[in-house]
């Protein structure tokens, strides 16, 4: 039986009419929250990765648009229900374009737009704005519940598999940050780790530093230290040596988009881990809510991979000084996501509905069938 959940870090502070987001680009050296007052504020927070993690991006976007709309109504900038409706639709389109790879943002705002389209625009501006606020708050609350289910299903499945070869406690390898900082609470992949820790079944979690933004080193380790979760930080390039020399029971990662055939877009370096896990016989799992499933995209070949500024590789994040020599024949390639083929997800896809293992033959996953499950 799983133990009750503990309090975790919060990157999203919301009360009706007010939203503050933790600036994750400054962690762990500074803890700074920024108020979101306008739609432009939430767009910038997502684009500049002050808020990051597919679930957190979607939740923050919904709440940010809600707060910005309410403020405009309160100051009289939006005077009618039809003006509010038009502003909401335009805002959803605007924020949707802030980051292209994570499907949660697109799905969330697409669904919200569909509901806004059905609003009665003849009602007063305040009532139309309030209706959207309630929708956004429901998105926030739902994400917490999804994470709780993911962590329980994932921990139980991994423990059951480990017991088959005599392991009572497990060691997990992960990448990037998929915890409370990347979601509304608890996390997806790191949520599974949390549940193992709460149940006293975690031997250790190994966290890849996750260059170039160091989300593993800056954020995952930060969460683990705050809660006393046993954690070892490794360089990204040490993963193969770790799997060879230490007992790793499973690799558990998050996702920004899971295509119909199981191909998974996630933080750059995830594909590397999947290849290494396959070679070393370590089960590889992806943990994500069904909000991250994209049955409309056939495979990873059709996913737009975001590329970011070369300075993220060439410049020290803290000092802002360039640490790489420059020259006319030097080029920098900085994709921030990669595609892990579904066939390499050997353990399964963990969602709030349970753990879906791979089929024996291609395609190894049928994402539409997972979405359709009750």
Swiss-Prot record:
What is its EC class?
A: isomerase
Name the residues annotated as site: Transition state stabilizer.
Answer: 176
Pathway the protein takes part in = Amino-acid biosynthesis; L-methionine biosynthesis via salvage pathway; L-methionine from S-methyl-5-thio-alpha-D-ribose 1-phosphate: step 1/6
EC nos: 5.3.1.23
**For this UniProt entry, what is the primary localization, expressed as one broad class?**
cytoplasm
Alphabetically sorted, this entry's keywords are: Amino-acid biosynthesis, Cytoplasm, Isomerase, Methionine biosynthesis, Nucleus
The family line of this record is: Belongs to the eIF-2B alpha/beta/delta subunits family. MtnA subfamily.
Function per UniProt: Catalyzes the interconversion of methylthioribose-1-phosphate (MTR-1-P) into methylthioribulose-1-phosphate (MTRu-1-P).
Q: HAMAP family per the record?
A: Salvage_MtnA
Q: Give the protein's recorded name.
A: Methylthioribose-1-phosphate isomerase
Organism, by scientific name, is: Leishmania braziliensis
């Amino acid at each position: 039986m799983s133990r009750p959940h503990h309090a975790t870090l919060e990157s999203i502070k919301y009360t009706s009419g007010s939203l503050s987001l933790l600036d994750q680009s400054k962690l762990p050296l500074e803890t700074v929250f920024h108020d979101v007052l306008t739609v432009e504020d939430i767009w910038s927070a997502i684009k500049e990765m002050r808020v990051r993690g597919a679930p957190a991006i979607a939740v923050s976007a919904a709440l940010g648009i809600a707060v910005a709309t309410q403020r405009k109504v309160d100051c009289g900038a939006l005077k009618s229900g039809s003006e509010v409706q038009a502003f909401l639709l335009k805002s959803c389109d605007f924020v949707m374009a802030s980051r292209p790879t994570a499907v949660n943002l697109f799905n969330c705002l697409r669904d919200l737009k569909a509901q806004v389209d059905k609003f009665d625009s003849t009602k007063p501006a305040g009532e139309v704005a309030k209706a959207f606020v309630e929708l956004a708050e429901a998105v926030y609350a739902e994400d917490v519940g999804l994470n709780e289910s993911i962590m329980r299903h994932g921990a139980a499945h991994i423990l059951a598999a480990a017991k088959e070869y005599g392991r009572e406690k497990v060691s997990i390898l992960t990448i990037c940050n998929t915890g409370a900082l990347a979601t509304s609470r608890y996390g997806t992949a790191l949520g599974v780790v949390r549940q193992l820790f709460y149940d006293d079944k975690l031997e250790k979690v190994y966290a890849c530093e996750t260059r170039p933004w160091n989300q593993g080193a800056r954020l995952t380790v930060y969460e683990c230290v705050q809660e006393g979760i046993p954690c070892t930080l490794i360089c990204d390039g040490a993963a193969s040596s770790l799997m060879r020399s230490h007992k790793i029971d499973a690799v558990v990662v998050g996702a920004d988009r899971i295509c119909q055939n199981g191909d998974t877009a996630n933080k750059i370096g995830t594909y590397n881990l999947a290849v290494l896990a396959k070679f070393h016989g370590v089960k590889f799992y992806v943990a994500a809510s069904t909000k991250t499933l994209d049955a409309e995209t056939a495979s990873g070949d059709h996913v737009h991979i975001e590329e970011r500024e070369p300075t993220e590789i060439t410049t020290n994040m803290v000092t802002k000084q360039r640490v790489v020599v420059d020259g006319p024949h030097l080029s920098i390639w900085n994709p921030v996501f990669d595609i892990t083929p579904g066939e390499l997800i050997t353990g399964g896809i963990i969602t709030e509905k349970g753990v879906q293992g791979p089929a024996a033959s291609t395609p190894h996953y049928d994402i539409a069938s997972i979405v359709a499950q009750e």
